[in-house]
Structure formats: C-alpha cells, structure tokens
C-alpha cells in the first residue's frame, strides 16, 4: 500500500517559492559538465546513478555500490541512497531519533556499532513517489568518508543536511549562512 502524504504537508509543499523552473539571480551559472542545484525540481527527482559510490570509515568499507539513487531537490546538493544489498550492516546499529521529510516521509537513523552519533538515515516506508528508496541508506559526508568515482564528497553546510557536494555541483546551497528561507 502506498503511503500518502498528509494534506497538511501538501499545503506546506505548495508554499515553496523556488521549484527549479527558473534559476534565481543569485544562483551560479553552470558551465559545461556542471549541475546547478537551482535547476533541480521540487518535488525532488529520483535519478539512478551507476557511478561507483563508496562509504567508509578509516579502512572499513561500509558501502560499495554501482546501483545508487540520487535525489535531486531545488537548492540542495544531491543526496545519494545506496541499496541495502550493498551495505555492510555488521558495522551499523540503529541510532535514536527520527525526522520527517515533507517529500520522502519518516526517516530513522543509524550509527556505527558501539557509537551513538548518527552517520546516516533511511526511509522504511517512504511517501508515494519515493518507493524506489525504501530501505536504501544515505550517509552524512561530514561524519564518514564518501566517494563518487574516487572523488571525495564534501558535506553540505548546516549540520542537519546530508547533501553530497562534488566538483560538478554548484549552488549556492541550502544550509549556508543566510539560506534559512530557501
């Protein structure tokens, strides 16, 4: 059964100003081979990614995949979700806390075994339209090493956000100082 988005949340979604149809004047202009986060849509797009994605801490590989999914949302760097078959769950444990994404639904967090700090999250039963990422995991590049085709991913600013910033992604990005209203 599809998990429907509650009406109160649909109303909140309708209030967004930036939806990816028109790049705002403050957005950087992309050059060849670059992607502007201001061209990403809202609601977010789901895009398969066959590049090699590796997540590790020290020498321990947490995830290694060529079957990731990128979520592309206006104003944010892509968030990369990795299928459960490509995750080394022996290194992970459930972490406390949860959050609600207006597009994807209720997220739960996980941490490294023996630690408490969340390093990533997952949606067990995402809202309709995002079923493709059910039980896929995403990681915070600020807390673990994340790579796309051997390029080290930089974390999105703001602490809470989990966007994956690589050399082809340009902004400015939500989470930077002064971006609270985006």
Model-derived features: positions:
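Terminal leader/tail segments of proteins
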Residues: 1-182
